[in-house]
UniProtKB/Swiss-Prot annotation:
The chain crosses the membrane at residues 260-273, 280-289, 358-367, 375-387. Pfam families: Thiol_cytolys_C, Thiol_cytolysin. It is found in: Secreted; Host cell membrane. It comes from Streptococcus pyogenes serotype M6 (strain ATCC BAA-946 / MGAS10394). GO terms for molecular function: cholesterol binding; toxin activity. Keywords: Cytolysis, Hemolysis, Host cell membrane, Host membrane, Lipid-binding, Membrane, Secreted, Signal, Toxin, Transmembrane, Transmembrane beta strand, Virulence. GO terms for biological process: killing of cells of another organism. A cholesterol-dependent toxin that causes cytolysis by forming pores in cholesterol containing host membranes. After binding to target membranes, the protein undergoes a major conformation change, leading to its insertion in the host membrane and formation of an oligomeric pore complex. Cholesterol is required for binding to host membranes, membrane insertion and pore formation; cholesterol binding is mediated by a Thr-Leu pair in the C-terminus. Can be reversibly inactivated by oxidation. The keyword Signal applies. This is Streptolysin O.
Amino acid sequence: MSNKKTFKKYSRVAGLLTVALIIGNLVTANAESNKQNTASTETTTTNEQPKPESSELTIEKAGQKMDDMLNSNDMIKLAPKEMPLESAEKEEKKSEDKKKSEEDHTEEINDKIYSLNYNELEVLAKNGETIENFVPKEGVKKADKFIVIERKKKNINTTPVDISIIDSVTDRTYPAALQLANKGFTENKPDAVVTKRNPQKIHIDLPGMGDKATVEVNDPTYANVSTAIDNLVNQWHDNYSGGNTLPARTQYTESMVYSKSQIEAALNVNSKILDGTLGIDFKSISKGEKKVMIAAYKQIFYTVSANLPNNPADVFDKSVTFKDLQRKGVSNEAPPLFVSNVAYGRTVFVKLETSSKSNDVEAAFSAALKGTDVKTNGKYSDILENSSFTAVVLGGDAAEHNKVVTKDFDVIRNVIKDNATFSRKNPAYPISYTSVFLKNNKIAGVNNRTEYVETTSTEYTSGKINLSHQGAYVAQYEILWDEINYDDKGKEVITKRRWDNNWYSKTSPFSTVIPLGANSRNIRIMARECTGLAWEWWRKVIDERDVKLSKEINVNISGSTLSPYGSITYK
């Protein structure tokens, strides 16, 4: 109770002090007013008794009121002036932001990124297909043909360091861009790390520019870096090109196509891009109905490089914290990457496709791509005459040769040669890039591992054996062969076949035709003649155990009993 009275007393005192302050202000104001009227007052009141001033009356009344309030039990309520809460929070946040921007987190960034624990090969591992079940061999009969489709399980493991650029990722694959080393990166869909950055120097390797080839970009965003590169290129055209064109540096790779994951690993390009532009029929390839080769020509006009940082924090504004980077996805499982260089030029993809079942298809395609004159090679020439070719150009003056489909490979050669020089009319296009780990500047190579089924098809044509006996003796034949088929598990099924007239005696002249199916193998031809000699009644004239299947196998025997002659020729 005493505490309550004490509190009331002090509340009254506080209230009275406030009132006193207000009265003091009023008194001061009255005093000023009285001063101004002093002269007139003195003139009119010289013979009158002085009256108390109004300010004195006010003070007297206020003092009496204060005494009454001190002796009262009533609470004095003060209404404090309220500040808007929203305004206060804004001021507080503004203050915090300013403080944060002035803080230097360089050491923290370096320590945290250097302490990230990861395996470069594992975080960028791309595991493609795993092959478990497949039919190793399959036989298909078509009219007088027998097609053997053979499948073999293969592995491919590549670690390319230059990654193909597609339109959808150019805004996150520019020089000095920051990325995450995660699954998206391995699939050519990198995740960008966007945050406040320090200025960044970039360099273009166009000849003759000297120191002018290096510029500093204050805020290295995609837009700012692209503008800086455009300015450098225009500067080269205006001042250093001498009106001359710049020949491209060409990189060339080729591979037969067996599966999507295999061609991605072999050429380091997204199979969706190839499929969308070239129209690869993977289904027909897996069935052995088509054979396809893809060649990729990278024609590089120039490369733009970003200066590598000495320490990870060099690329960030000092206000950036490691928590900021964590919110962007940086972790042990997804360490940060830095795009160190980008190659600009154009890419030409060429598809060579045939339905030929020849085992020389790959060799014929390679010879054509390398510019070898295949017309002198009958086998290669036949394959190319029954092939189609498609070329797609990305970059440069692509409008001229956007997509070309032809039966004449010379047209494809012209597409590759045309516009292979850099000029204003034939501009460069970002075609590939290389990234490094921000922690140590090690090159980030995608570790492609995939299994695939290599499908080859061999076509066999039915044939026949032409027997001709012109010898002066009695002859006998033994004709044997196997017919090959495959069950639904790909296991070879062999059926033994023989000529119905084996071991029957034949006198000259004699001739007949024995038809052979397209699936005939292991052909054996034996012919013998009767000598009439007691110690050698039968003598072999022909005994061939590995006769190859041909359209016509001509077996001729002639001569006498003591001097027989035999031959096998093919047609």
